[in-house]
Amino acid sequence: MNELEQWRKDPLVIKLMATEEVFWLNPHIDSFKSAVRKLSLHEDDVKDAEKRLDRFAPYIAKVFPGTNQAHGMIESPLVQIPSMKQSLEQKYLQPITGNLLLKCDSHLPISGSIKARGGIYEVLKHAEQLALQHGLLTVQDDYSILDSETCRDFFANYSIAVGSTGNLGLSIGIISAKLGFNVSVHMSADAKQWKKDLLRSKNVNVIEYEDDYSQAVEEGRREAEQDPTCYFVDDEQSQDLFLGYAVAAFRLKKQLAEQKITVDESHPLFVYLPCGVGGAPGGITFGLKLLFEDHVHCFFAEPTHSPSMLLGLLTGLHERISVQEIGLDNRTEADGLAVGRPSRLVSRLMKPLLSGSFTIDDDKLFTLLKELADAEGLFLEPSALAGMLGPIKLVQEGNHYLKANNLAEKMNNATHIIWGTGGSMVPEEEMMAYYRRGGTIK
């Protein structure tokens, strides 16, 4: 019997195969001090990324006026959601002890999703390297000089390619086109039409596939290999994407301090992150662990039809197993999470850092979307709601984790952050269709 056949008999895998919601605790999590010694990336790598984003801030502020107030910083609000907390408590008959906040990457400037972090960072890094090599820039310069015909004409000699289910493609497409690059976005069958239309309106070459995300990435990679002037943003194994996301943790630390929210041994922090291929939630988890070590507890949320990271970590097969191999179709309305196989880089980095993962049914994404809109006036896209039930599931199904980590008696002092990953770019009529659908599901 091969390894895959053995795993198909595992009780949790049987539930995954039946598209039942599951809650999984990672048995491989290690203390941060022990885990960090085995990791291939370190705090200096994240600080280097943060400094690069700071250098680009004058350019970003100049070409994206929506970032002016933040002086070219691509950042999102951290907000309390007390009415949503009350709504969840009443619906699930479960008190949520401690603070409940929403990190509104749904409202990040430029591309309206978490992918504005890693995607834009990686393109900026590539642009910086080219400009430095060809004498268009020094690191002492004001980077707003890149907003010139000379620089755009220079970047037009180069191209960028990416495979995406949607939001990463938006981020890469928008920033690459703004700099002057030729850019191709290879999009999978589940990518939303409005995302393709928006990219085409910005002169981005959109190539569509009948198949899923993995094929789109593979085709993008193949295109880049055939053209020495083409740079491929590899969502499955890019360190630069990962580090761009990790910077978010350093920004979040400042926001928590501004709101006088303490994170220490007596005040645990729980963060719930939607997960597709893993780059964004993995990078943020890595950054948070660097800062808060064992006082932060990160959980990934995935659709019941696409639990690729959970499956890879549970089996220890990482990117060597896909959800299709256990009979799942990888079809979900949470388009950004429709990934059948996890990132090789991220799944291995998460093995000692991640507290656990859970899955959520598509219908619940829509009911939560409507509930959040009604309670707080905040509209997120379906995939961005994947983590919303994390605090409920943690208490109902993760009590063992709380006891094992001496957290049960500290929960009154806990802070729960739901990472809202996208939504502000969704066309109004599309968002209202989501909202109405949330009202029809019983």
Curated annotation (Swiss-Prot):
**What reactions does this protein catalyze?**
D-serine = pyruvate + NH4(+)
- The answer to whether UniProt assigns keyword Lyase to this entry is yes
Xref: Pfam families: PALP
Tell me which domain of life the UniProt entry assigns to the organism this sequence originates from: Bacteria
Enzyme nomenclature, EC number = 4.3.1.18
The N6-(pyridoxal phosphate)lysine modification is found at K115
GO BP field: D-serine catabolic process; isoleucine biosynthetic process
Q: Which cofactor does it need?
A: pyridoxal 5'-phosphate
Keyword tags: Lyase, Pyridoxal phosphate
The molecular function terms in GO held by this entry are: D-serine ammonia-lyase activity; hydro-lyase activity; pyridoxal phosphate binding
Q: Which PANTHER family match?
A: D-SERINE DEHYDRATASE (PTHR48078:SF9), THREONINE DEHYDRATASE, MITOCHONDRIAL-RELATED (PTHR48078)
Of which family is this protein a member? Belongs to the serine/threonine dehydratase family. DsdA subfamily.
Q: Which NCBIfam families match?
A: D_Ser_am_lyase, PRK02991.1
* Protein's UniProt name: Probable D-serine dehydratase
Which species does the entry assign this protein to?
Halalkalibacterium halodurans (strain ATCC BAA-125 / DSM 18197 / FERM 7344 / JCM 9153 / C-125) (Bacillus halodurans)
Q: Which gene encodes it?
A: dsdA
